[in-house]
């Protein structure tokens, strides 16, 4: 069904195509063959662990716990997911997060007794504008309210509203700071009679660039040049 039916897996001229071939079944196969070659050539002089994550698209809820157990003490970690067109190697990547904002108001007839109500939609609008001020493209920090809904009818003061917020950030410090700022903004009430709650936070931590990572990239670059790759 779906993509698998529209673009089924096939092998033609020694090349495999289809969903997941590049991202990242080919990387998994490459890992296995590389490990086998290193072992046969006697080039493994330290413990090496291969780990395959089955739930990465969901945020690795299960695999992340295993990673936390095997990573301490590791000299290096290499991910065989494709980095980009032309064989690019990724040495850093932004983290991401999701937050879910809910606002409760009080319903009333918008024509007969408007003042008896408290609009959750107006309140979430104020909060959304406040949250948007944390956007900082120069720092690589994005804060996006991508989904919003609320109310029951056009002639009713909205008794509820909710939104979903997506975050990306380059450093863990920036991610933690923006989550704290969003929670603070949500705690401030503009429309009397409304209340709000927010859940969620950082989902995937950033892969921050560092000196050790740059040194590892240098080794990868040198190895690529030996194979005629640049």
PLM regions: where:
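Conserved short hydrophobic patches within well-ordered secondary structure
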Residues: 1, 21-24, 51, 70-71, ...
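Acidic/His- and Gly-rich active-site-bordering loop/insert found
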Residues: 1-19, 39-41
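Short, flexible, glycine/charge-rich loop motifs used to bind or transfer phosphoryl groups or to couple energy/partner
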Residues: 6, 39-41, 66-68, 90, ...
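Glycine/serine-rich anion-binding loops at beta->alpha junctions
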Residues: 15-29, 109
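Acidic/histidine-rich catalytic neighborhood of metal-dependent amide-processing enzymes
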Residues: 24-94
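Metal-dependent amide/peptide-bond hydrolase catalytic core
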Residues: 82-83, 91, 97-230
